[in-house]
A protein has these predicted regions:
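N-terminal beta1-alpha1-beta2 module of alpha/beta enzyme domains
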Residues: 1-21, 104
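Short, acidic/polar
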Residues: 36, 110-118, 247-257
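Long, low-complexity C-terminal extensions of enzymes
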Residues: 239, 246-298
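Conserved, mostly hydrophobic/aromatic
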Residues: 9, 40, 79, 119, ...
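Hydrophobic faces of well-ordered beta-strands that scaffold small-molecule active sites
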Residues: 17-21, 48-52, 106-110, 126-128, ...
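Glycine-rich anion/phosphate-binding loops
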Residues: 26-39, 244-249
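Acidic (Asp/Glu)-rich catalytic clusters
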Residues: 6-15, 37-48, 120-121, 150-155, ...
Length: 299
């Protein structure tokens, strides 16, 4: 359970931000999530956030469907009101009220234009998950701002974060294969992301390729093998959807992203593949602050 881990982290730390990156109403009731994150915030005041998303692989593997945009919007509204200490009508005998309410910001992780606009209408912050190509980042931020204007909100009030799949390795051949699998994973669920940069999928139908990849190109057990399935993808396409390579290379790529001119409040370097808990280390969570961030500060 993420909230057990977050509670331990809250007690043992004093500065880092804490929170689930992508919760989904398909897996937990929004009122339960509001209560859980408020409890964590009581242990780490002002250091928490609650991240929402439609859910994809996680809910599909549970036999459920991703959350619809309208459902996510309603869950976001309910959660924010509960965290603000308001009474909320929930079709029960009495309105619901969170008696230990805390002012925890609610973020939404989004890829598609409808979800991005919805996040702009109702979230405190938006985690944009579209890779690192400037055209995709720009289009995504424009969609968030459009949603904010639809709700008579100031776009500047909405914080922007980036989720960037990050392949930290000195083995550049391995990095090249995994980065291709990452690009295919974006095309698998969000093919519209190939349009702003002017990319073309020039290989077999993705549905045919998926028959040999489980559960998908982002979460395959062997990301090098899944990358070989899409070796036809160009370097430009592979480079557009992840940070990859040595600490020096990743620092340079991240510096480029932060130099596009957009105001970015937070970057989440999402490790790919997921680190093995039995690894002797140093692992991703140690290498990024010790090896990547110092290089970034030098640029």
């Amino acid at each position: 359970d993420p909230y057990v881990t977050l509670a331990f982290a809250a007690v043992e730390t004093t500065r880092i931000g804490l929170g689930p990156l992508i919760e989904t109403p398909m897996m937990r009731n929004p009122a339960v999530m509001a209560s859980s994150i408020a409890t964590v915030d009581s242990l780490a005041p002002g250091r928490t956030l609650l991240g929402y998303g439609v859910g994809d692989t996680a809910v599909r593997l549970m036999g459920k469907r991703p959350t619809r945009v309208a459902e996510l919007e309603e869950a976001t509204k309910l959660t924010r009101r509960l965290l603000a200490g308001e009474e909320v009508e929930v079709n029960a005998a009495r309105p619901a009220v969170l008696r230990h309410a805390r002012p925890v910001p609610v973020w939404i992780a989004a890829v598609g234009p409808r979800t991005l606009r919805m996040a702009g209408r109702g979230a405190d912050g938006v985690f944009i998950r579209v890779g690192r190509h400037e055209a995709n980042i720009r289009v995504a931020i424009e969609a968030v701002h459009q949603g904010a204007l639809e709700a008579d909100r100031d776009p500047a009030d909405i914080r922007i974060g980036l989720i960037l799949h990050t392949i930290l390795t000195d083995d550049l051949d391995r990095a090249a294969l995994i980065s291709r699998s990452m690009a295919a994973g974006y095309y698998e669920y969000s093919p519209m992301l190939f349009d702003p940069p002017g990319f073309t999928w020039n290989g077999p139908d993705i549905e045919e390729l998926k028959k040999d990849v489980w559960p998908d190109f982002h979460h395959a057990a062997d990301l090098e093998a899944s990358g070989r399935k899409v070796s036809f993808l160009s370097d430009d396409i592979a480079n557009a959807f992840s940070l990859f390579g040595t600490p020096e290379m990743i620092a340079e790529q991240l510096y480029q992203v932060l130099s596009f001119g957009h105001k970015i409040h937070m970057v989440i370097p999402h490790p790919m593949p997921t680190p093995n808990p039995s690894s002797p280390g140093p692992d991703f969570i140690e290498r990024v602050p010790l090896e990547v961030i110092p290089k970034l500060k030098e640029l």
